[in-house]
Amino acid sequence: MGETARILVIDDDENIRKVLATILEDEGYKVDLVDTAKKAIEKTKRNFYNIALIDVRLPDMEGIELLTKMKDTTPKMRKIIITGYPTLQNAIQAVNRGADAYIVKPFDMEKVLKTIEEQLKMQKAEEKYSQERVAEFIETRVKELSVEKEATHK
């Protein structure tokens, strides 16, 4: 994995938070836990997270609404919705508001780990693509400036 991935677990159920933390930390991830959307927003202002596991039902805000708030402030963070109340409507809303994956409770931890791994690979691929585009732009711009410089010195 190289650098340790950071995961933010946002769930109001303490048992779920503890189970996820134990398993994810055993897999080598750095994990932070919060029980409200407000605390999640505060954490993401101070720290970078590769992934957020977001419960649909939180005491202060719906997880879907939290997705919308996080979409602009944490665009590189992968967002995975976890819910014990799966409906087609909330699945569609989740995807439309920026969820990268959707997991139904009670969840199979193997599926959760596989989803996290897939999301991290996608995040890494997007980052590499972005870096390549920047390098391409810089290379093109340097060539253009060199041509302009030569033209002005003639």
Regions found by a protein language model. Give the residues of each.
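Acidic catalytic/metal-coordinating carboxylates
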Residues: A5, T36, E62-E65
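The feature encodes the CheY-like receiver
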Residues: R17, P59, T83
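Short hydrophobic/Thr-rich beta-strand motif most characteristic of the beta2 strand and flanking loop
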Residues: G28-D35, K43
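Short amphipathic alpha-helix used as the core "switch/output" element in two-component signaling
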Residues: E42, I64-K76
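Active-site residues of response regulator receiver
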Residues: D55
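C-terminal output helix
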Residues: F107-E117
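CheY-like receiver
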Residues: Q123-K154
